[in-house]
Amino acid sequence: MKRVFPILILCLSLMSVAKAQVGGERIYSFLNIPTSATQAALGGEALTVKDNVNQPLWNPATISRFMDNQAAVNYVNYLAGINVGSATFAHLINRRFGTLHGGIQYIDYGEFIAADEDGTETGDFGARDLAVSIGYAYNIPWSDFYVGANVKFLSSKIENFTSQGLASDIGIYYYSDYRPYSFTAVIRNLGYQITPYEEQREEIAYDVAVGASYLMKDVPIKWHLTINSLQQWNLAVPNPSNSNTDLDGNTEEESISFLDNMMRHFVIGVELFPEKNFNLRFGYNFRRAAELKLAEARTFAGLSAGFGLKMGRFKFDYAFTKYHPVDNSSTFTLYIDLARKGF
C-alpha cells in the first residue's frame, strides 16, 4: 500500500499521454495562467522555484517535506475584469512516504449578454472554469533527483454547456543544497476531455518545458530560465497591428525571423535577495512581448515585476504584469505557515 498513490498517479499520467491528441480546438487553457505572485513576477513560467507551496501547480517534482503544513491563497486581477484565484496546501504524511500536495484553481470570466440570431437580448450568462489537483513527489534514492506528478480534475461551464476532464503533470527535478544550480523538465496538462461541451471532444492545451536556475556566489541574485512549448517549434503568428500597407493598398504581413521565433520559447526571471525576508523579482516573457507589441508605440509588454515580504508565519507577495497599454494584471499571494505558533 505504500506505493499505491505514486503508481496511481503514474498510470493516470500515462493514460493522459495516450489520449492527449483527440482533435478539435484546445481547451482548459486557464491552466496556463500564473496564479501566484512569485510565478507572475518571474515572467509567468519559472519552473525551479524552491520550497514554495504554490510551485507544484507548475512543477510537481518540486514538492518537498519543507512544504509541510504550508498554505497559500492567491488572487489575480486579470485582464478585462476576469477574476482568477487559487489555493494550495501541503502535508507531510511521514518521512518514509513523503508529502502530499493539493491545489484548487478557479477562473470567473464574468457575465455576458445572451442574444438570439437576430440580435435580440435574451438575458445573460456566465462562464467559469475549475481545477482540483493532488500531487506527490519522490526523491530517487541516493541521488539529488526528484520525480513528481499531479492529477487534475477539471470542470468548465459556459452558459448551459458543461465539460469535465482529467489531466496530469509529470516532472523531474535536480536540486542539491551543495550546488548553486538546479534544472528540471516538465510535461504539463496532458489530459483527456471526459465530457465534451457538445458532441465532439477537444484537445487540452498541454506544454513541454525545461528550466534551470542559478544562485550567484558573491551577489544575492538568483536567475531563472525556462524554455517552453517544446512540443511546437513554430510559435510565430503575424500580428495584424504590425503589418505594412503600401501606396497601392497592398498589405504585407509582419516578417518573423528564425531568431524571433526561437526567442518566443524563452522566459527569464531574476530574484534579488532570494533568501531574505524581503526580496525583489523581475521577469521577461519573450513570447508575450512579441505577440502584444505595437509598431507605433512602446508597450513594455512581456515585462513583470514584484516583491515578497515575510513577517513571522506570514508572507505577502505581489506582482505586476504588463500586457498592453490599456490593460495590466496584478497578482496577490498570502502564504501561511500553519506549523508555526503565534504571529
Describe the residue ranges of each PLM region.
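Subset of outer-membrane beta-barrel
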Residues: Q21-F343
